[in-house]
UniProtKB/Swiss-Prot annotation:
One of its GO terms (cellular component) is plasma membrane. It is a multi-pass membrane protein. This is C4-dicarboxylate transport protein. Responsible for the transport of dicarboxylates such as succinate, fumarate, and malate from the periplasm across the membrane.
């Protein structure tokens, strides 16, 4: 097959767009902030098809299962994996902050901090308890779940729908075939929308640099550097070890999903690459049923980057305000963060709201301390989203391997670049 010219390759276009966005934001900030609708529009186009794709993928995957106990088994294994890896992420964030101490030397008096700037985040954080979160998974109506784009609600509907179709067997085949055909159409739409990724990445990056400025990074470069370094270590060491035991290279896996990662980098939203990630995981040999269950669930329950960020941010605020936390208080922080992180989604700003929820339950550290990192949170959001999407991709491959539903030949060929993986191919075929 004839190789594409480099300027027609999507990830090259996205890289170029990000660079142009940074330049525009730095030299022409007023004009750059007007580019925000380009990024927002691209994310909305992707979110437009996320719900239907999750529904169709999960329904056809479950409907094709001969053993309905498998649904619970896959879900149980996924949740077990999520909890174990999330704990590693939380502990790594805590350890890195203790080791590198990015907050030491600020010597800030908590009484001088103005919490008005973060009041809206605190209000959102207080607005939902664990019970509310669980009840929110049940939609008011099926239509409402799709209209609001609530991933967990759509997943619940799909689980019920697919289970009934599996029970009906041949009598439900007409519906299953229709949904399978609809899946092909939806991924075709994703292929069209993905071509607009460079425009979306340009708009989002130009707005970020134009609004916040590169200069806002300087005072807190140590915290940003610590977070990025810790996330890289997590991916290469923790996820890399898991990948090695599963039989694949984390470096090759990251290279395989580079286009999705660049879209996430440009938009700061891991949701922006969800449909493409699901399709690529199927192309790499993961079964449709596992992809359909693990990836959407992971967007609420397996946010590794957010977990690293939370323990690091809390400890940074404590160091900056000279507040000493006992080991018992830090263990409490880990337990609280494990719970509050489950309500985070893959959209920009969700990590900051989750941080507010964590601080609200740990009264030793003032909530107003969040103002210290408010200005740089947008720059840390990219790293959170990148780590989250890699973590969910690895989780899907691992659970597929546990279920013995991983085609290792496809995985090997995909990671080596021997398979022509294009969005126009039909998922699950």
């Amino acid at each position: 097959m004839k190789k594409k010219p480099f300027y027609k390759v999507l990830y090259v276009q996205v890289i170029f767009a990000i660079i142009v966005g940074v330049i525009l934001g730095h030299f022409y900030p007023a004009l750059a902030t007007d580019m925000k609708p380009l990024g927002d529009g691209f994310i909305k186009l992707i979110k437009m098809v996320i719900g239907p794709i999750i529904f169709c993928t999960v329904v056809t995957g479950i409907a094709g299962m001969e053993d309905m106990k498998k649904v619970g088994r896959v879900g149980g294994k996924a949740l077990l994996y999520f909890e174990i890896v999330s704990t590693f992420a939380l502990l790594l964030g805590l350890a890195a902050t203790h080791l590198l101490r990015p907050g030491v030397g600020f010597n800030i008096d908590p009484a001088t901090l103005d919490g008005k700037a973060v009041a809206s985040y605190a209000a959102k954080a207080h607005g939902q308890s664990t019970v509310d979160f669980l009840m929110h998974i049940i939609p008011n109506t099926m239509v409402d779940a799709f209209a609001q784009g609530e991933i967990l609600q759509i997943l619940l509907i799909a689980l019920l729908f697919g289970s009934v179709l599996a029970h009906l067997g041949e009598r439900g085949k007409v519906v299953t075939d229709f949904i399978d055909g609809l899946t092909r159409v939806l991924f075709g739409i994703v292929h069209i929308v993905t071509k607009l990724a460079p425009i979306g990445a340009f708009g989002a990056m130009a707005f970020t640099i134009g609004k916040y400025g590169v200069g806002s990074l300087v005072p807190l470069l140590k915290l940003i550097g610590t977070f990025y370094l810790t996330s890289i270590v997590f991916v290469l060491v923790v996820l890399g070890t898991i990948a090695r035991f599963t039989g694949f290279s984390i470096v090759r896996f990251v290279s395989y999903i580079k286009e999705e990662l660049l879209i996430v980098l440009g938009t700061s939203s891991s949701e922006a690459a969800l449909p493409q990630l699901m399709e690529k995981l199927e192309k790499a040999g993961c079964s449709r049923s596992v992809v359909g269950l693990v990836v959407p669930t992971g967007y609420s329950f397996n946010l590794d980057g957010t977990n690293i960020y939370m323990t690091m941010a809390v400890l940074f605020i404590a160091q900056a305000t000279n507040i000493e936390l006992t080991w018992m208080q830090q263990l409490t922080l880990l337990a609280v963060a494990m719970l509050t992180s489950k309500g985070a989604s893959g959209v920009t700003g969700a990590g900051f709201i989750t941080l507010a929820a964590t601080l609200a339950v740990v009264p030793t550290i003032p909530l107003s301390g969040m103002v210290l990192i408010l200005g740089i949170d947008r720059f840390m959001s990219e790293c959170r989203a990148l780590t989250n999407i890699v973590g969910n991709g690895v989780a899907t491959v691992v659970v597929s391997a546990w279920e013995k539903e991983l085609d290792r030949n496809k995985l090997r060929d995909a990671l080596k670049g021997n398979r022509d993986v294009t969005p126009t191919e039909t998922a699950g075929v």
